[in-house]
Amino acid sequence: MPLLIVAIGIVALLLLIMGLKLNTFVSLIIVSFGVALALGMPLDDIVKTIEEGLGGTLGHIALIFGLGAMLGRLIADSGGAQRIAMTLVNKFGEENIQWAVVIASFIIGVALFFEVALVLLIPIVFAISKELEISISYLGIPMTAALSVTHGFLPPHPGPTAIAGELGANIGEVLLYGIIVAIPTVLLAGPLFTKLAKKIVPQSFEKMGSIASLGEQKTFKLEETPGFGISVFTAMLPVIIMSISTVITLIQETMGLADNSLLAAVRLIGNASTSMVISLLVAIYTMGIARKIPIKQVMDSCSTAITQIGMMLLIIGGGGAFKQVLINGGVGDYVAELFKGTAMSPILLAWVIAAILRISLGSATVAALSTTGLVLPMLGQSDVNLALVVLATGAGSVIASHVNDAGFWMFKEYFGLSMKETFATWTLLETIIAVAGLGFTLLLSLFV
């Protein structure tokens, strides 16, 4: 019965978002109330549960998400992202242009959120495509593959950051293992899949695409942008700090070293929130002050970034509220009881649930957060590495993007594809990322 109620709730969510065109956040809150009532939760507890879920989720990720958005905006507005992309293109040359786009997209994708990175990179990729007279899809598929993988697997992106917080996973481990899983996944879903896509829908590689909807794009002369080295360093600084801290902590645990104030300081600096604060301060200097940009202009970029993520934060909070209703309403315990004694790995189970919710709901972040509410009770009975459960959930949450996902329509319109061509490229690309991500995560679980 609880699963039937959840299924009805998901259908209702679909109808509200797609049928009635209601705002996603509002729809999530309405469905959270409805599901809570249907599950028989005490009336006095319903509002408390929704507030607990929304506040608990945002309390963990709002700082990381907000600082990450500001960091990305500074890199974009200073021309640092354009410098990274164009330098790699010039170094790799026309013959290896696809690899240049993949590497640039991966680096920029770590620092910028999916939509921001896509809007930033697409004009650059279009310009390269036009200059070299090659298909926009030939460059666009590996570009979106890299952005989608970083979005689904790597902190400080909202999905993996929020899941790690809900499951109590070490965010540094999520980042470290996420990079290990992400690199081969990008190679499969990017350059290798492009060859397959060219055979499946060759006509899509003849389309010109259009970026008119993006309006006038801010472009920089290369000499006006920050240096390549400092741009890459600034974009990757959160990754560097968290990775070093995680490696030191793993060495401490492996060697059984006694805790001390130095190791405590390393953990503090390596905490996701602290590393983002440090990285933002560095970016304010390297992308602004060091280049004689007025501090007001730098702060305007930061303010713009916060304005742009306001609704996304509310949607994440709404997903957290729905997740908490599933937990407090007993659905998570019911699922745990259902799978009690089964041989199914929590990693695989998390992926399956996230995949089903993703196909149903469209939003990767909402699917991932809702999944945590269902698998969390099971994890107490397992010794599985929580960072791997985060990665599996992230992988499942990007599967089979279709008409209920904004990314589907963005890809279709920018690259000028038909519905059939979009399904054969974008939807298949996202599915390859999900399946490859699961495969590499399961492989990694044999060693950690």
UniProtKB/Swiss-Prot annotation:
<keyword id="KW-1003">Cell membrane</keyword>
<feature type="transmembrane region" description="Helical">
    <location>
        <begin position="347"/>
        <end position="367"/>
    </location>
</feature>
<feature type="transmembrane region" description="Helical">
    <location>
        <begin position="174"/>
        <end position="194"/>
    </location>
</feature>
<feature type="transmembrane region" description="Helical">
    <location>
        <begin position="23"/>
        <end position="43"/>
    </location>
</feature>
<keyword id="KW-1133">Transmembrane helix</keyword>
<feature type="transmembrane region" description="Helical">
    <location>
        <begin position="228"/>
        <end position="248"/>
    </location>
</feature>
<dbReference type="Pfam" id="PF02447">
    <property type="entry name" value="GntP_permease"/>
</dbReference>
<feature type="transmembrane region" description="Helical">
    <location>
        <begin position="134"/>
        <end position="154"/>
    </location>
</feature>
<feature type="transmembrane region" description="Helical">
    <location>
        <begin position="269"/>
        <end position="289"/>
    </location>
</feature>
<keyword id="KW-0472">Membrane</keyword>
<keyword id="KW-0762">Sugar transport</keyword>
<comment type="similarity">
    <text>Belongs to the GntP permease family.</text>
</comment>
<feature type="transmembrane region" description="Helical">
    <location>
        <begin position="373"/>
        <end position="393"/>
    </location>
</feature>
<comment type="pathway">
    <text>Carbohydrate acid metabolism; D-gluconate degradation.</text>
</comment>
<feature type="transmembrane region" description="Helical">
    <location>
        <begin position="428"/>
        <end position="448"/>
    </location>
</feature>
<dbReference type="GO" id="GO:0005886">
    <property type="term" value="C:plasma membrane"/>
</dbReference>
<dbReference type="GO" id="GO:0019521">
    <property type="term" value="P:D-gluconate metabolic process"/>
</dbReference>
<dbReference type="InterPro" id="IPR003474">
    <property type="entry name" value="Glcn_transporter"/>
</dbReference>
<dbReference type="GO" id="GO:0015128">
    <property type="term" value="F:gluconate transmembrane transporter activity"/>
</dbReference>
<feature type="transmembrane region" description="Helical">
    <location>
        <begin position="2"/>
        <end position="22"/>
    </location>
</feature>
<keyword id="KW-0813">Transport</keyword>
<keyword id="KW-0812">Transmembrane</keyword>
<protein>
    <recommendedName>
        <fullName>Gluconate permease</fullName>
    </recommendedName>
</protein>
<feature type="transmembrane region" description="Helical">
    <location>
        <begin position="302"/>
        <end position="322"/>
    </location>
</feature>
<keyword id="KW-0311">Gluconate utilization</keyword>
<feature type="transmembrane region" description="Helical">
    <location>
        <begin position="106"/>
        <end position="126"/>
    </location>
</feature>
<feature type="transmembrane region" description="Helical">
    <location>
        <begin position="52"/>
        <end position="72"/>
    </location>
</feature>
